[in-house]
Amino acid sequence: MPSLLNEAHRLIEQRGVRFLLTGSSARKLRRGGVNLLGGRARTRHLHPLTSYELGARFDLARVLRAGLLPSIYFSDDPRADLEAYAGTYLREEVMAEGATRNIPAFGRFLRIAALCNATMVNFTNVANDSQVPRTTVYEYFGILKDTLVLHELPAWRRSVKRKPIVSSKYYFFDPGVVASLQGRQVALGTPEYGELFETWLHHELISHRDYQSGEPLTYWRSTSGFEVDFILGDHTGVEAKAKETVGPQDLRGLAALAEEKLLERHICVSLEPRRRIVRGIEIWPYRDFIEALWSGEFGG
């Protein structure tokens, strides 16, 4: 690979050749100090399938069960394929990268990390549960981020009335993969279902950011416990609620953030069948929201 990048560099400089180079991680290359085509290459991220790409073949129940990796989404046996994917990742991705030699320890960590999906991570607890030092846990989280298995969601810090928390949250890149690693079978109405629904919505939002809008994606949580799952740029707060009937308690975070008068819109994405507005907060059916998202209503 280093010699290939050097040759690409030469052809770019001497002949003006254009290349499309793909890969799952540049971790090993960066550690080796090789030519990364600085200033001559643009980085783009390719995510699993989106609702926009699936069109009429999009099925939320299947998404939360199988995830959005193309070969698994359309598989006749997604559960078996997801289990095999986790094994392939451990064997090929981690070992080939030379990221860690202790595969059993990393395997324990990976399943504990999956249980921390969509949360602020307590690294000490993860270290204790994984039976590895905390410094190793930081290293392992770095591996997951570098290999694009895990996304870090920074905190939005502009609120004034309520002091914001500054710690990041973490999301696995695919709801099917994280559910498989957790070893869970989810049912509508359970907290686990809500977490996967939120993970799917994060996937749609981060894909839209990388493919269209380019705007920052963050989340907000106050030290007093109010939280909004996602902030689009500095204009829209979005809360994910996997409920067929959204009540006032479900809107507490959005209502608290609305008091700051910093955002233009406050939206709850839900399983409700029709759009409605409650005290300035918009409640959207998830299908309507993602159609509006990809049509550019929220930027891009």
What residues fall within each predicted segment?
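Conserved ATPase-coupling elements of RecA-like P-loop NTPase cores
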Residues: 1-8, 31-32
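Structural recognition of the conserved hydrophobic beta-strand(s) that form the central parallel beta-sheet
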Residues: 18-24
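Short, polar loop motifs at secondary-structure junctions
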Residues: 26-28, 268-275
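Short regulatory helix/loop adjacent to the ATP-binding pocket of P-loop NTPases
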Residues: 27-42, 58
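Accessory nucleic acid-recognition modules appended to NTPase machines
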Residues: 80-236
